[in-house]
Amino acid sequence: MGNDLRTLSAPSLTILNNPAVIAVSQDPEGRSVTRVRRELNIAKDKYGVGEIQVWSGSLFGGDQVVLLLNAAGEDAQISASLEEIFLHDGPEGSAPQVSEEWEVYDLWGNRMDDALAQKILDADDKEVEKLWKQANWYNATEMSYKDGLKKWDERLMGKKIGKIAPGGTLSAKVKRHSVEMYRLKSIGHGGKRKVHAKEEL
């Protein structure tokens, strides 16, 4: 982090301390996400820049992370089929994961609210510890992200928002110049798979 923690704002704290997102960056598999789609024929911003991208990557335990990036000049409905999401595991829908059912977790769905974040920033050391415990916030010094993922700690999953049927599609309204981030968890079974990395992030 390149920011000054002494002048950190509440919204910034809620971004930096999101355990569901941090768990992806600390994933034991240590794999990169790959871009599976890029669209340029969309609305541009005032600088003449605009595109939509879909990124996907495998996670610990057979989970999958999916990012829907809207770098366009207006809000957009972005969809990604399981065939696209698991493109590097098998072309033209041949990946076994395409025929599975998946639970969808919004990794920003349980983000700390700004009011609590401000209380934490304003509190002294003793009060801060109390606030963290009351919030039941994930503490990586007490349990590593790897161990938390093994136990399927709900604080590392985000907010469950639905399911994707076999052969189905993930779809979301994404605000301009923003990104939505999801964890997919197979219902029934996950499993190891080959990863054919292309354009990595």
Outline where the language-model segments fall.
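Active-site-proximal substrate-binding groove within the catalytic cores of carbohydrate-active enzymes
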Residues: 1-110, 123-128, 135-151, 174, ...
